[in-house]
């Protein structure tokens, strides 16, 4: 009797499989660029009619990690410097050119993005101005503090349609309490969460009530609710 052993997928193979099989409204987003390898995998697997939004601060800066240092204080990691970042971005733009895929890069911290673009992002495509405030796929790649991750979940919860998928990387860096907190947040956000060997994969089970409304409620740093009034412009296509 012969036994066939099934090879486990690598993280990039699994990521490519999820993105490639996804059929959902909205843009795709990656929070945190890292080495750029995950972005390459996502970009290669993204449909031609989708835009990938990448959010990452450009240049050397310190940011808090999930875990504490040896003395119990929040550990700090310095992001890659300008020269490394430009090399990573150059490789991504080369891939985009060769594959005819497109991505939008926002050089800022994730919290700043959430504050600035509560009512959606604008871009031009074939001469048409487009506004989108939906994210059907989100890859949380930021190795930052749990508080920032919560803000990202709050922001995306209002903007992810039914069957949208979130993937959380670096799950082995979370302690037991952080994993429990993520489970609680996924339940509150109506996400069906599955812990895998490399990722937490969560799928939206219902439509958010106000995902496409011009008046979009969002969370601010002081935990107050902001309402941004956006006038309806007939020349803009809303996605």
Regions found by a protein language model. Name each.
Residues 2-5, 12-239:
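S-adenosylmethionine/decaboxylated-SAM
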């Amino acid at each position: 009797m012969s036994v066939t052993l099934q090879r486990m997928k690598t993280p990039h193979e699994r990521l490519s499989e999820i993105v490639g099989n996804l059929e959902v409204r909205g843009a795709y987003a990656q929070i945190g660029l890292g080495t750029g390898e995950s972005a390459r995998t996502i970009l290669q697997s993204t449909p031609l009619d989708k835009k990938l939004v990448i959010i990452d601060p450009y240049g050397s800066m310190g940011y808090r990690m999930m875990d504490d240092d040896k003395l119990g204080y929040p550990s700090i990691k310095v992001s890659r410097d300008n020269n490394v970042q430009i090399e990573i971005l150059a490789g991504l733009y080369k891939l985009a050119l060769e594959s005819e895929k497109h991505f939008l890069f926002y050089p800022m911290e994730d919290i700043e993005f959430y504050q600035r673009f509560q009512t959606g992002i604008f871009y031009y495509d074939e001469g048409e101005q487009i506004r989108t405030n939906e994210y059907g796929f989100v890859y949380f790649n930021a190795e930052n503090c749990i508080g920032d991750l919560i803000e990202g979940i709050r922001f995306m919860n209002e903007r992810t349609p039914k069957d949208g998928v979130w993937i959380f990387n670096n799950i082995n860096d979370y302690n037991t309490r952080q994993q429990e907190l993520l489970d609680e947040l996924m339940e509150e956000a109506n996400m069906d969460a599955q812990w895998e060997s490399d990722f937490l994969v969560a799928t939206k089970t219902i439509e958010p009530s106000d995902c496409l409304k011009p008046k979009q409620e969002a969370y601010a740093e002081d935990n107050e609710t902001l309402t941004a009034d956006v006038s309806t412009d007939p020349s803009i296509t809303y996605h």
